C-alpha cells in the first residue's frame, strides 16, 4: 500500500518533478488540487502544464529539508537549471489528504527565477 504520510508524499512529488517523471504525479496530485504561486492560482491541469513548461530547463531538484506536521509538509529544495539562473532555492508548502496532495503553495525569489523564464521564452522562439 502506498504511503499516506505527508513527508513521504511531499518528498516523492519533488523527486518525481526533478526526474521529469510525470507518471507518479497523476497519483500524487489530487484531482481537486489547488496550487498557488506568484499571485496565481491553478488547478491540477494548470499546475501540470506549468511544470511541463519548466521541465526543459530543469536539470534536477536537490532536496535540502523536508518538515512535516500532520497533513502538512514543507519542502526546501534547489531547482537546478541549465540556465544562467543555475540553482534557485524554492519552498513548497503542501497539504495531503487521503494520500494525495490537495494544496501547494510555492515560494521562490522571482528575481532569481527570472532568467529561467527568459531563457525558456528564447528557446521557444527558435
Model regions: which residues?
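C-terminal and inter-domain tail/linker signature
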Residues: 1-126
Amino acid at each position: 500500500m502506498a504511503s499516506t504520510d505527508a513527508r513521504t508524499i511531499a518528498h516523492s512529488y519533488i523527486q518525481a518533478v526533478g526526474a521529469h517523471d510525470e507518471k507518479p504525479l497523476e497519483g500524487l496530485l489530487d484531482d481537486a488540487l489547488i496550487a498557488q504561486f506568484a499571485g496565481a492560482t491553478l488547478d491540477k491541469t494548470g499546475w501540470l502544464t506549468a511544470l511541463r513548461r519548466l521541465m526543459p530547463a530543469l536539470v534536477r531538484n536537490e532536496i535540502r529539508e523536508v518538515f512535516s506536521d500532520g497533513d502538512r509538509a514543507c519542502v526546501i529544495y534547489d531547482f537546478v537549471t541549465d540556465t544562467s539562473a543555475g540553482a534557485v532555492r524554492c519552498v513548497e508548502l503542501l497539504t495531503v489528504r487521503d494520500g494525495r496532495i490537495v494544496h501547494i503553495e510555492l515560494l521562490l525569489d522571482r528575481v532569481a527565477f527570472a532568467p529561467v523564464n527568459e531563457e525558456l521564452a528564447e528557446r521557444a522562439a527558435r
